[in-house]
Every structure is written in C-alpha cells, then in structure tokens.
A protein has these predicted regions:
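Sec-dependent signal peptide recognition
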Residues: 3-10
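C-terminal motif of bacterial Sec signal peptides marking the signal peptidase cleavage site
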Residues: 15-18
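Enrichment for repetitive, rod-forming helical segments
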Residues: 10-11, 27
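Compositionally biased intrinsically disordered regions enriched in Thr/Gly
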Residues: 22-302
C-alpha cells in the first residue's frame, strides 16, 4: 500500500475521531456468535477468518530473493450475511505489505457501495472495480515491476473487517491502518477507527441517530464515560479529557447488550493508556436515547 495513502488516512483518522460527535470459488462459514463488542466479537471474526479455507489463493515464493506473495479472494458468511474477503500479503527485502478487506456483497447493491465507499474513502479505491485495483497492485509487486524509490525497508497494514452483524440490520466495522519504518521509528504509527452502518441503506450511523438532542442528556452520557475512563486509568490525573458531551465521539459500535466507545492514543489521556474502550449497557443508556431513534427501537421495541 502506497505510504502517502496510509499517511493520509492516519491524519484523517485522528481528525475524525477527535472532531466528530483470478476466478473465485465460494465457501461459506458460519462463525460463532459474538458475545461482546469490545473483545469477543473481534475474536469471533478472527476465528471466522482462520476457519475459511483459502480456496482461491495464489502463493509465489522465491527462496533466493526471500520473496513471498499470497493472494486470497473468497466469499464468507458472517452472522448470516455474505461478505467477500480480499487478502493480499507481500513480503520482500524492501517491504512487508498486508491488506485485508472484508466487504459486504449481500442484499442491496447500492447500500453495499455506500458502505465500501465510506470505509475506503481515504484510499482511492473504487467500489465498482476494487478487485481489479487490488489485483493490479499485487501483480505489479509480484512481477517486480513496482518500486518505491528511496524508501528503506518498511511495513504497512490495512485491515478492514466487520466485528459483528447485529440483527442482520446493522454491521460494525473496524479499520486498522499502520506504517512502520524500523530505520526511522521506535514503533509503528497506527490508527484504529470504528463504524456502524445500516445494511439496508448503507448509511453510517451517527450520534444524532441514537441520542436525545438535549444538551443535558448528552452531557450526562459524557460524564458517565469520563467516570469509566478514570476507572480504566486508575486515577483522574491520567485522564486529561474533560467530562462532557465531547466524549461522545464518532468511533463507536453497538450490539444487543450495549454500546462501546473507542478512543485513540492521546485522545483522552497519555500514550501509556493505549486505546481505551468504554462500554455502556443498554439499561443505563435507555433514559438518554432518542425515542424514535435506531437504538431505542432495536433494544426496547423489538
């Protein structure tokens, strides 16, 4: 993956989280149901990926040059909804580049296109020709016709995959992007961003679709999040974000039990805190929800 594209995303990711309130054979795999947004649903996806047979994989290896390439394009079923998984792994003396995109292909084609365009907006991919674009880039590397002149050895990752499908109506996504130049950096630069989408419309779900518009209610949720962050950190001094509605960021997911907010390094506290997560139960959130909103309808009217 071109480093300029990755750098662009890393910059955009921090801005968004900080400011916004060949021939394909098919195989379907039914994964274990996820039981927790923050941890177990990620594990469920990992189990799903591990259990999918690599039925259309291409592996090229040249031991003399220490080059290795892997390409996988396969259909997979996650919580009853079909996705297509694209996996491209390139390892040479100059770079290590891993790309995995797990994208919706079930149901409404226009909705799927909206989701894909939103997820890959910072990567110059076209939803209508994404496979051709990925294969062209992979083939260029594999044939030795692609070079990033002047670069030292570097590593990059772009992983975009669903954490869970919720009630076959909504899908939560994680987008992980990282870059690392060992000769220049002590650790990788990375960003993890989370999204919720309506599978029927392709629209991204925002805070305004969930919470009551009153400032008092949103302030109360923000104060609760701050309290949970303090518990996570162990003391209030390590949380420099103020208690309030500003903590209701755009990086969140939900499931049948509640809602989880995710924060980037340095967003709410020092680097040593990592990426804090705050889970709020649906029972606690009920008084603050928009009564005609998505979550109130899903949690309390079904």
């Amino acid at each position: 993956m071109n480093k300029k594209i990755i750098y662009g995303f890393l910059l955009v990711a921090f801005a968004v989280v900080g400011c916004k309130s060949g021939e394909n054979k098919e195989v379907t795999v039914e994964p274990e149901q996820s039981v927790s947004v923050a941890k177990d649903s990620v594990v469920a996806v990992e189990k799903t990926e591990a259990s999918v047979e690599l039925v259309d994989s291409t592996k090229l290896a040249d031991n003399a040059d220490k080059k290795s390439y892997e390409k996988v394009i396969v259909d997979t079923l996650i919580d009853g909804v079909k996705f297509k998984r694209y996996y491209f792994d390139i390892r040479t003396d100059e770079l290590a580049d891993e790309t995995m995109l797990v994208l919706p292909v079930d149901g409404n084609a226009d909705a799927n296109k909206k989701i894909i365009d939103r997820l890959l907006d910072d990567y110059s991919f076209d939803a209508d020709s994404i496979q051709q674009q990925l294969e062209a880039q992979f083939d260029a590397y594999a044939s030795g016709n692609f070079a990033e002149e002047g670069d030292d050895y570097h590593e990059s990752e772009l992983l975009v995959y669903p954490l869970a499908v919720v009630d076959k109506k909504y899908v939560s996504y994680m987008l992980h992007s990282s870059l690392f130049w060992p000769s220049e950096q002590n650790h990788p630069q990375w960003a993890d961003v989370y999204f919720m989408f309506d599978l029927n419309t392709g629209e991204i779900i925002l805070q305004d679709d969930i919470f009551d518009a009153s400032a008092e209610n949103r302030q109360a949720v923000g104060v609760k999040i701050h309290d949970e962050l303090v518990k996570f950190a162990g003391n209030e001094e390590d949380i420099f974000a103020e208690a309030g509605a500003e903590l209701l960021n755009a990086s969140f997911v939900f499931d049948d039990k509640g809602m989880t907010f995710f924060y980037q390094p340095y967003e709410v506290g020092p680097y040593m805190l990592g990426e804090p997560e705050v889970h709020l139960s649906k029972e606690w959130l009920e008084p603050y929800l928009k009564k005609d909103g998505i979550l109130y309808d899903y949690w309390f009217k079904n």
